[in-house]
Amino acid sequence: VDAAAFTKPLLLRFGDRVLLMSATILDPPTYLASLGLDPDEVAVVRAPSTFPPERRPVRLRPVARLTRHHLEADLPKLAAAVVELMRRHPQEKGVVHAHSYRIARAIEVAVPADLRGRLRTHHDASGRDAALAAHLDDPGPTVLLTPSMTEGIDLAMDASRWQAICKVPWPFLGDPQVAARRARDPDWYAWRTCLTVVQAYGRSVRSADDAAVTYL
């Protein structure tokens, strides 16, 4: 649903001043356009993060081309990189944002027997909550392998000390709504992609005294 047509009648009409707060606005012009707001009627106030950068480092590790034409050939490279990260963090819980069930399955089958017991994963949406609960309830260094938990979950402190974002999460252009919104506003497509990355990044560091490393 495009919220722009509903923002004023359903939200803004309840007050003379409205405060919208978010850690993931990212690009104010695109955000305002998505809500149908006139930039001349909005004041944008930026506040610095209270989370120290040294406690939430990002490591860039390009290892595979996961576009449609290269996915099949390069999936083993990605899986090998995830296995290496599991070995690098033998005593720490982590989360692997796989982007799709196909990628998640390829990683799952590539994990060697000595590490497979650490994996907590699901093969469709119905298993999502059970996989998350299995990860959180296990005191051991489990690794949550999922394509669908970039937002809405809290992996604070020891629930995740490292995470991997396996692929740039471009929205699926086969979705008619996505295709129509990109055609109308190309900036929205890039903004939505960056938003998903930032949301995934935020799953593991939940407070100023938390810490986790993110691999891209």
Task: Go through each PLM region and give its residues.
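Conserved interdomain hinge at the start of the Helicase C-terminal
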Residues: 9-13, 60-99
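A short beta-strand-to-loop transition that corresponds to the Sensor-1 phosphate-sensing loop
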Residues: 21-25, 99-101, 146-149, 166-168
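Conserved RecA-like ASCE P-loop NTPase motor core of nucleic-acid helicases/translocases
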Residues: 18-23, 92-103, 215-216
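Conserved helicase motor "Helicase C" RecA-like lobe of SF1/SF2 P-loop NTPases
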Residues: 94-124
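Short glycine-/polar-rich loops that comprise or flank the Walker A/P-loop
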Residues: 14-16, 39-42, 54-57, 92, ...
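Conserved RecA-like P-loop NTPase helicase motor core
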Residues: 62-73, 123-216
